[in-house]
Design a protein with these regions (language model features):
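Active-site-adjacent "gating/activation" loops or surface patches in catalytic cores
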Residues: 223-247, 251
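Generic, well-ordered alpha-helical scaffold segments in large soluble proteins
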Residues: 41-46, 98, 102, 137, ...
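Glycine-rich cofactor-pocket loops
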Residues: 158-180, 285-301, 332-341, 365-380
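A helix-coil-helix interface module used to build multimeric assemblies
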Residues: 1-216, 220-231, 294, 307-309, ...
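Amphipathic, heptad-repeat alpha-helical segments used for oligomerization and assembly
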Residues: 240-261, 336, 340, 420-423
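Short amphipathic alpha-helical segments with heptad-repeat character
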Residues: 135-143, 147-150, 154, 184-187, ...
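Glycine-rich anion/phosphate-binding loop at the beta-strand->alpha-helix junction
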Residues: 193, 246-332
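Long, amphipathic alpha-helical stalk/connector segments used for oligomerization, subunit docking
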Residues: 309, 313-400, 404
Length: 456
């Protein structure tokens, strides 16, 4: 193993521990593990087809032996495959040769050893392996970690539902909301993208060198190969069958998947920046951890480093995922090899995503609302009530309500409760409406924000 301090990529160096869960999935070992699963399940599937007499049904013992290799593929096994590849200079062929050698002592498999990789092009094995890897990453890592963020934010939205906050549009004071409602907005966005990620299909094919079952049909013309291959992809592997391909599966679903991850990342980048700003305004304080240093020269500093780290890593993720989404669906004629090296970087895009998720969650866990700062901003900005006053004036037919409030408040300093009180008292509107306006404060002018936050 490489010493993390000597690693070229920070994913395998400084951040190695944070992406540990992805290593068995996206490493070269992970790709080999998936290839072994596909090759052996394909052999098992061939043995279930009565018209392929040369591969009779396997005994329970043989099936158990095959499953053991699938489930227990080890780093030592991967090293043995690499040793074979040193001679073949072909990674998929090395898997085939290793499997033949590995099962030389299992009579039923040894007798059918030439049906390992039968009628397959390398891409038949690779595309299914990549689909299995992405599916595993989604189920084992991405969805659970995103669910953790959504759960944390939902709790914060409920807890802070009634804490009033001055909004800012264009960076300027705007109609109040609550802290909880602003967080609820993010929760709703993430929930939608979570569902999109959940619904993503992972496509696969095993239809030969150019997608037409050419070799299959020559060898066994009486087999319904399309049905057989569909059942293999969908039932044996749990993927979605793609019936129309060239040599490679076109990777459109990969682009969809990576774009779905990018949308999640973009939402979190947006929220990272907002929280960074709220910390700067004093709306949130950060819990201080003993022993930590905020600046090498300014001892007082408590910086929003987790949100900055998250923003940076999610930006890196989106750069990689964006390239994958744009490049992978493009291949010259029936195939070129440009996708091969690019696909080895799937784990990089997902890895930076996971780093960004983890940093964001760390930051959330350090946040504490600062009610005093929130209240002070609201209390210093009574011009926020110009909106409700002119709206009520419109209801009761007062002439030029917007213009009157604009003249009273726009660009003016020192709009106090007293100034607004005098203005309201001068209005020719029903006494009940006037009384309600006189009772209104910036902190109370939050509409349905609390209700909306609690409902998320």
């Amino acid at each position: 193993m490489i010493n993390p301090i000597a690693a070229l990529s920070p994913l395998d160096g400084r951040y190695a521990k944070s992406v540990e869960a992805l290593r068995p999935i996206f490493s070269e070992y992970g790709l080999m593990r998936a290839r072994v699963k596909v090759e052996l399940n394909w052999l098992k599937a061939l043995a279930t087809e009565p018209k392929i007499a040369e591969v009779p049904a396997f005994s329970d013992f043989t099936l158990a032996e095959i499953d053991k290799v699938i489930e227990n593929f080890s780093l030592e096994d991967a090293a043995a495959v690499k040793a074979i590849e040193a001679t073949t200079n072909h990674d998929v062929k090395a898997i085939e040769y290793w499997l033949k050698e590995r099962f030389s002592g299992v009579p039923e498999v040894a007798a059918a050893s030439e049906f390992i990789h039968f009628a397959c092009t390398s891409e038949d094995i690779n595309n299914l392996s990549h689909a299995l890897m992405l599916q595993e990453a989604r189920e084992a890592v991405l969805l659970p970690k995103l669910a953790e963020i959504i759960e944390k934010l939902t709790g914060m939205a409920h807890e802070l539902a009634a804490v009033p906050m001055m909004s800012r549009t264009h960076g300027q004071p705007a109609t109040p909301s609550t802290l909880g409602k602003e967080i609820a907005n993010v929760v709703y966005r993430l929930q939608r993208q979570f569902k999109n990620l959940q619904a993503q299909e992972f496509l696969g094919k095993i239809n030969g060198a150019v997608g037409n079952y050419n070799a299959h049909m020559v060898a066994y013309p009486d087999v319904d190969w399309e049905t057989h291959c569909r059942n293999f992809v969908e039932i044996s592997l749990g993927l979605t069958f793609n019936p129309y391909t060239i040599q490679i599966e076109p990777h459109d679903y990969m682009a969809e998947f990576f774009q779905a991850i990018s949308r999640v990342n973009t939402i979190l980048i947006d929220f990272n920046r907002d929280v960074w700003g709220y910390i700067s305004l004093g709306y949130f304080k950060q819990k201080v951890k003993a022993g930590e240093v905020g600046s090498s020269t300014m001892p007082h500093k408590v910086n929003p480093i987790d949100f900055e780290n998250s923003e940076g890593n999610l930006g890196m993720a989106n750069a990689v995922l964006g390239f994958l989404s744009e490049k992978l669906p493009i291949s010259r004629w029936q195939r070129d090899l440009t996708d091969s090296t690019v696909l080895r970087n799937m784990g990089v895009g997902v890895g930076y995503t996971v780093l960004g998720f983890a940093a964001h969650l760390r930051g959330l866990n350090k946040l504490e609302p600062n009610p005093a700062a929130l209240a002070a901003d609201l209390d210093a900005t009574w011009e926020l009530l110009a909106e409700p006053i002119q709206t009520v004036m419109r209801r009761y037919g007062v002439a030029n309500p917007y213009e009157k409030l604009k003249d009273l408040t726009r660009g003016k300093d020192g709009i106090t409760p007293e100034v607004l009180k005098l203005f309201i008292e001068s209005l020719e509107i029903p006494a009940e409406a006037k009384a309600k306006l006189l009772e209104l404060t910036p902190a109370l002018y939050v509409g349905k924000a609390e209700e909306l936050a609690k409902r998320i």
